[in-house]
Amino acid sequence: DSSIVVAAMAGLSEKPVKTFSIGFDHERFSELPHARKIAELYGTDHHEFVVSAEMSDVLPKLAWHYGEPYADSSALPSYYVSRETRRHVTVALNGDGGDEDFAGYVRYFAMKAARLYDAVPGPLKRVIMAGAEYLPEKDAPFSTLWKAKRFLRSGIFTDVSQRHLKMICYISEEDKQGLYTPAMLAAMGERRAGERPDAANYLAHGFEHAKGQDFVNQMLYTDVVTYLPECLMVKMDIASMANSLEARSPFLDHELMELAFRMPGDWKLKGLRGHKWIL
């Protein structure tokens, strides 16, 4: 997404565009090599920065800026890349929104594949899940096995909002409930048997509002009205403004988003592999 933004900027600018990228010591999670290729391709004035474990010292400061519990670990690199970028410019463009407009997340594949998994009989699903639970997990939540287990767990649900919730959650509903005090639970009201978890209800509104769309666009719409504004945009807004940097997201232009949602889901998610196919 950022690469497309850079390409557009380079095509409109008479001088080299300034680009900024942040990476990690661990190559598996670093996008710096790709960023360098894009910078070379478009002849940008490129700046790189690497986040190390020692830089977690800034966490108390970040907690102050966010002012409430915030669980996205990328708040840390977002803060640092904003700080480094502000040393050179006052306004920067980013690629936020591209994944939600054009189906860029792996979970969209998983949700689509889960509909095929629905054909597997329930008893067989339970046998498969029971066997998978005995397999050891490494590097969770990043290992392939951990993701496979999450997929199998989501297959238990037929309710699309609960399945979507299972795809994006890192803790179980039981563990989450265990964090609440009795007073908090009383304030929330007792949940009736068979009732959706509160988080699943929240996601269900997105799917219900997008009933006229195909399944892929229903997923995208749900993320556009939940994950995008309440996680990604919050993260970038606070991380950038904490460093007096104005961050702008071209993919969030309302006319572009309206155009994206007039496109059929198959233009974005082709089969089970071609994500962001139209791009």
Tell where the protein language model's regions lie, with residue ranges.
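Acidic, Mg2+-coordinating catalytic module of metal-dependent nucleases/exonucleases
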Residues: E208, V216
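A short, charged helix-loop
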Residues: R196-F207
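Basic, amphipathic alpha-helical recognition segments used for DNA target recognition
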Residues: V225
